[in-house]
Every structure is written in C-alpha cells, then in structure tokens.
Amino acid sequence: MQNFDLIKQKIKSLVKQLTKANYQYYNLSNPDLSDQQYDALLKELINLETRYPQFKLPYSPTLKIGGFVEKKFSTIKHKTPMMSLGNVFNLEEIKAFYDRIVKKIPTFSLLTELKIDGVAISLKYQKGILVQALTRGNGIWGEDITKNAQTIKTIPLRLKEDLDLEVRGEIYLSHPAFEKLNAQRKQENKPLFSNPRNAASGTLRQLNSAIVAQRNLSIFVYGISDPYLTKPTQKETLVFLTALGFTTNPHYYCVSNFENLLSVIEKYKTIKEQLTYDTDGIVIKINELAFHSLIGATAKAPRWATAYKFATITSQSIVQNIIFQVGRTGVITPVCKIMPVMVDGSLVSKVVLHNYDYICKKDIRIKDHVIVHKAGSVIPEILEVIKSKRTDLQKPTLMIEKCPACQTILEKQPGEVDYFCLNPNCREQKIQKLIHFVSKNAMDINVLGEQTIIAFFDKNLIAKPSDLYLLKKHKHILQEMPGFGAKKITNILDAIEASKQKGFEDVLFALGIKHIGKKVSQVLAKHFQTIENLQQATPELITQIREIGIKIAQSIQQYFSNSCNLEEVSKLKTLGVSFQSTNPQNPTTQTIFTNKKIVLTGTLQKYSRLQIQQILEQMGAIITNSLSLQNNYLIVGINAGSKLTKAQKLQIPIIEEKELQQIIENSQIKL
C-alpha cells in the first residue's frame, strides 16, 4: 500500500530544491547544483507528477517546460491601468520636466532606471503563487498569457513571502538568445525576426507554451501596482522586489539635483554599450512615492515620471537605384544605392536589402526618400520610407527573373525567401567563391584583393581555389601583367604557399559550403578532425552534434555528393592543403584551464584575440563573452574595460598577460 503522505512530502521537497536551484542559476548566476544533479531531480519530479497528478503543486518548476496549447488568448481588464510614459528627447526637455516638479515640491529625489526595450507585462500573485500574467494591451485591457509566462525561467512561480500582489515588468530577449533564435530560424528556412523586441513580442503571443519555453525570454520587474504594498521610495521598492525573488535591473541611481541627474545620464551612455540586451532610454521618476499623487497624471501618462530616449543617429537620403547581386552560393541579394550621406561618422552610399520579401515589406522604391541608420551601430539599414514625400514617380520594385551575371532563369524553393542562380558556371559566383576562399577568416591570403582575383580570373589563370596553388607554374604570365612586379609576385606566391598550413576549420570554411559559417566550421572540425570523417558522416550522425541541425547536415551531404566538389577537394589535398585538424578533439593533457570558463578583455601584446582564443581552447578552456559568477578566470590585457572592475567585485581570479605567458610555456600542450 502506498504512503501518499510520503509521496506528497517528496514532491514538495523536490519542488523546493529545484525552485532554489532555478533562482541560484537564473537570478544570481551562481548555480549550486551541477547540470546532471538538476536533470536527475527534475526527471524524478516529472515521474512523480505523472504518476500522482493530484499532488502536483501550482508552482511546480515543471511548468517551465511548457507544452500547454491555447486556442486563443482571452482579454482581461487590468486592476490598475498600465499607463505609458511621456518622452523627452534632449536636455532642455529634461530640465523642463525637472522644473515642473520643483514648482510643486521643492525637496525631492529622482530615481533613474534603464528603459528596457521589450514587452510590458503585469504579474498577479495570490498567497505568493503566480496566478495570472497579462500583456499591456491598450493599457486598460490585456491578453492573458499566464501559461506562457510560467515557462519564463526568471519569473518566479512562487515568491519568498505568501503575499497577494501585482507587479509590473518588461519581458525581453537578450542578444545571445536572439542570435541563437534567428540562427535556428535561418537553418529552418523561416523568416528572421528583425530585432529582439519583435522576437519577444511574437514569442509571448505563441499559442503553444512549449515554444515559449525554448526561446529563453527574460524579465526585469520594476514596480508594484498595489499601493498598500509599496515602500516609501522607488529605490526601496526595487530592493523589496529583489528580496521576494524577482529579477530587477541593477542599473539604477538615486540623485538629489539636476546636476547629478546630468552626470548619471552620461554614465548610462557607457553602460548602454556593455549591455547584452536592448534598451532605448532612461526612465526618470520621483523616488518618493508619496509625491506621485501630488504631481498627478494626464489621461495617458504620469507627470511624476518620463522616459529620456537615447538618440538614434539617423540621416535622410534618396534611393538612387536598387540592383541585384549574385553571391558565391548563387543567392540573389538586392542592394540599395542611395545618395551618399554621413551616418554615425561614416559615409554610406549603399544598403543591403537582404531579399525581395524585405523590399516588399518596407515598400522601398527607387527615388523614395528614406531614413538610414546603423543597425547595432555597425550595419547601414533603411529604418523607414518617408511616404509623405512619395509622388507618382516612385513605382513598386519588381523582382528580376534572370541572374544579373549570367542571365540564367532564377529559381526559388517553396517556403524559402531567397532566389537562386543554379548555374555552376556563373562567372560572378566563381569570382565570389575565390574571394571568399582567400578572405581573412578563411585561408587569409590577404595579398589577393578583389581586383587581383578578377584580373587573374579574366586571364584564365584561376577559376577555382585549387588553381591558386598552381599559379607558380604561370609566373611568366604574371610578370607580363601590368602592375605585377617581381616583389609583388613573390609576396603573392609566398602567401599562397603559407596558406597550406591553415587548420581544418579554416579550410572547411573556405570551401564555401552552404550554411557553413565560421562557427559551424569550428564545431565540425573539432568533432570530425578530418575531411574524410566528415565526408563519410550521414546527416543522422552530423545532427547528433548539439549545434548542428538537419539543414546544415543536408547541405554537407549535398556538397560531398557532387563529383566536381569531390574532385576539387582531392586536388587541394594533392597540392598540400591540410584537411586535418591541428587541435586534438579531447586533449589528454590536463591544464589549469581544462573545462574552465574564461573571459578575455583588453588587448594582449603577444597574441591577437583569435590566436589566444585558439590556444586557450587547445588547453581545454571554454571561452565566453559575458562575465558572471559562473566564470573561473578573467584574462586581461592593456586597456581592459569594465569587465575588470566587475571581476574584482565578483572576486573572479584575474590573470595578466605575463602570468598567462608563463602558464602557456609551462603547459605540455604543443602550440
């Protein structure tokens, strides 16, 4: 006979352990259980809840797994309206906001918080248990997304106190999670999300909560909507929320005058560049909550708070032409030629438009007036079309039917957004493949620029990568070409010869296999070690690698099923190009860095960032970009940034270059 009391107690115990582990991992970045221990406990809890569903707790961590499918979202009225904030865009407007408060309240303080670029949400708890989650909606009515919210790992299902309260927060998608999601969607041939906010919004509205669980959404909670539970100040409220188990944003400051406020705003400009999530401004609010009612609100927004929006550096230009280019894989990419304009410190004259669907979505036309900015402060992008300036002269952009280089009819696979030229003899594709082969992240033959490649191609000296390694046989032809002196020819031939020593991961990337980027080539080279192993691998075997999906596996199979590709690989091997990994997959020599998580910051004098990363990985290290308590070491060079300060606060061991060099020299790893 089963003892149900013991079963109930066991379930409660497992829930308590797993809830604590989740909080340690996702909120404090300080796990107290290994992955194996956590998985074992979770599996045990799932088994017990499956056998005894009557004992499943409403705040069980198994809810984080998802799997509930809604038919549609119901609409529920907010207990307290979710008001939007007014905006200010410059220091004069901030001063006006400040002065309006001073007229009514001579003595007060302000609290500044980051304005997270995400999706506003309201969370309702009864006796400390999450019972409802609503989107902002129109501020009065919101959609019930409770099942989805339960899967978000940084939303506590049970608070540390049994309170009835409603909190407000912002759901967001971090940059790493966004990049991973889009990489997966690209692999699955699905439309990419344009930015993390859109991805977060689209994810929250998924009817299947299992999809939400997979996308690693996060939350920052910033306020309590129940007046009787709030603390005297906003600062104390944030501390209280953190104590209850919520994740609050750490970047808040309390200031007592306008001069201090300006200093803090300057500080945020530095902070913003180091964040792993999007923020579009600063929220400035009166810190003392009792003063909020004195200042009041308009019908749309409170007067006691405002949002200072970070300036987006944009410029206006005119679309002069839209051309279509063919790449090394045959993909057709539209490029927008615009009237040259300065954007964020550099002259921009063209903008890549990704694909024809992108053109249609933004309705970009020749002679349109457009607003241009730099996405991620790097890549020029058309932010929007100024349709108020459009006339009858602007006609919809039509997709071309033939390859712009070889006039082959273009093809588009069902469900794909890209058009392709499938002609293997397309001149432009061949040139682009050669340019890719010699590029920095591939074979790194930097003396061969684009114009040199084209000149050699037009002279029938090269048509495929293996021809580069036969150029020395045509030295007499090179000597007759204008601009190619003896020294230049020697430099070219020496650089080509030196490239034979490049590692397997570089050569694999240089081959230009569809969907095989630099990171994927590193993963494949590390796993398979040789080109022969990769050739013989089935898609089923390849997809057993965690980072590799079926689309990449099929692309590899298709590449090695082509006799021309096999012949080219064979020629390259015969000519001395290495197709074997220089780094052993599992180094037997243990080092101080074996299985240790390491972050790099600053500039090393002896090594480039790529070189030291490869050395550390060969010594068994795991290189990460962001710094947290999970990291074992921080390696610092000159001009180290804020990561050094953070590591000191977190008491993470710091290794300087001199000490690092001694560790490398004392290791038994062959470099």
Swiss-Prot record:
InterPro entries: BRCT_dom, BRCT_dom_sf, DisA/LigA_HHH, DNA_ligase, DNA_ligase_AS, DNAligase_adenylation, DNAligase_N, Hlx-hairpin-Hlx_DNA-bd_motif. Zn(2+) binds at residues 403, 406, 421, 426. Its cofactor is Mg(2+); Mn(2+). Its EC number is 6.5.1.2. NAD(+) binds at residues 35-39, 84-85, 113, 136, 170, 285, 309. It holds the Pfam family Nlig-Ia. Residues 588-671 form the BRCT domain. It comes from the Bacteria. One of its GO terms (biological process) is DNA replication. GO terms for molecular function: DNA binding; DNA ligase (NAD+) activity; metal ion binding. Keywords: DNA damage, DNA repair, DNA replication, Ligase, Magnesium, Manganese, Metal-binding, NAD, Zinc. The active site is at 115 (n6-amp-lysine intermediate). It catalyses: NAD(+) + (deoxyribonucleotide)n-3'-hydroxyl + 5'-phospho-(deoxyribonucleotide)m = (deoxyribonucleotide)n+m + AMP + beta-nicotinamide D-nucleotide. It is an enzyme of class 6 (ligase). One of its GO terms (cellular component) is cytosol. DNA ligase that catalyzes the formation of phosphodiester linkages between 5'-phosphoryl and 3'-hydroxyl groups in double-stranded DNA using NAD as a coenzyme and as the energy source for the reaction. It is essential for DNA replication and repair of damaged DNA. Belongs to the NAD-dependent DNA ligase family. LigA subfamily. This is DNA ligase. It comes from Onion yellows phytoplasma (strain OY-M). The gene is ligA.
